[in-house]
Amino acid sequence: MTRKNLKFMVAALAVAMTAGIFTGCAGKSTSETKQTGLSGSITASGSTALQPLADLASQKFTDKNPGATVSVQGGGSGTGLTQVSSGSSQIGNSDIYAKDKTGIDATALKDNKVCVIGFAAVTNKKANVTSLTKQQLIGIFTGKIKNWKEVGGADIKITIINRAKSSGTRATFIKYALDGKQEAAGLTEDSSGAVEKVVKQTDGAISYLALSYFADATKKEGLNVLKIDGVEATTANITTDKYKIWSYEHMYTKGESTGVTKAFLTYMLSDEMKASIVKLGYIPMADMKATRD
């Protein structure tokens, strides 16, 4: 081997070693970036109507941020507001405004509206009714109307299926469908799935469900989703407030959010989540033409 060739090989080896050193440094930097990214655990609890969307958002968010954990729990809007107020949850999911919940300091909570949801009265198919006036609906739920034949339906006794008192769905339905009047005594179910099952199995049953529950169209089988005053519960009718039984979906925090909580709320309102909001039967905030307090 000539002296010239030897010098060339030494130079080539030096270049290769230097490149290896820098490659190693780059690899270490990438690893450190992943380790020092967003991390921590939070809990979002409350509304079962919002839970399907919150569950999906949690999954997508943690896929993007593997160091973060978002635990989503139900329990109803009242439970969510109580838990975020006490600090046992970082986010309180609610169908109702915090000011409408007794026993908490609503002024300590920050409202984050993430979408809109509609609700509808539903009956067993055998009731043979597809539309009611608002006054008929109130009459049924307050116990003044006791048989479906009184509103043009079948000769079947009406059975009322209520939701638990902690339910934001119940509070919203009472406020906007029943004008604040309390329902008569009836059966009580604590979840949308239970309501669907009991209404389908009980001739003459009536209750109410979030429209997002029908993102799976098969769940409508065996049920009539009622028009009210001739107005159907559709996205178009809700965005213009033509159909009145709807509410904002709130994600309350105790004061200003930080860290994982803040990042998760930002993600909930991102363009990426908008398609999921629509797909799951909710309405993006930006699509609303009407507002309410």
Regions found by a protein language model. Give the residues of each.
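Bacterial N-terminal signal peptides that target proteins for export
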Residues: T2-A12
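Exported/periplasmic ABC-transporter solute-binding proteins
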Residues: R3, I21, A26-G78, T82-S85, ...
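Bacterial N-terminal signal peptides
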Residues: A12-G20
